[in-house]
Curated annotation (Swiss-Prot):
Pfam families: SHP. GO terms for molecular function: channel activity. Glycans are attached at N52. It is found in: Virion membrane; Host cell membrane; Host Golgi apparatus membrane; Host endoplasmic reticulum membrane. This is Small hydrophobic protein. The gene is SH. The keyword DNA damage does not apply. The record marks H22 as: Involved in opening and closing mechanism of the pentameric structure. Residues 1-20 are intravirion.
Length: 65
């Protein structure tokens, strides 16, 4: 029975640190996911504008000829 009280003291002592570390890790992972998504969206939009520019050039070439 004496062993359980030690574990309760141990968990209650380190519980705030555990929750703090958990929150920090969660925030970091969310930030990483958000930055990756933003980078992907930027690449997609750049690709889209590039495609639009090439299409416009092709149309201009057809009009000129």
């Amino acid at each position: 029975m004496g062993n359980t009280s030690i574990t309760i003291e141990f968990t209650s002592k380190f519980w705030p640190y555990f929750t703090l570390i958990h929150m920090i890790l969660t925030l970091i992972s969310l930030l990483i996911i958000i930055t990756i998504m933003i980078a992907i969206l930027n690449k997609l939009s750049e690709h889209k504008t590039f495609c639009n520019n090439t299409l416009e050039l092709g149309q201009m070439h057809q009009i000129n000829t």
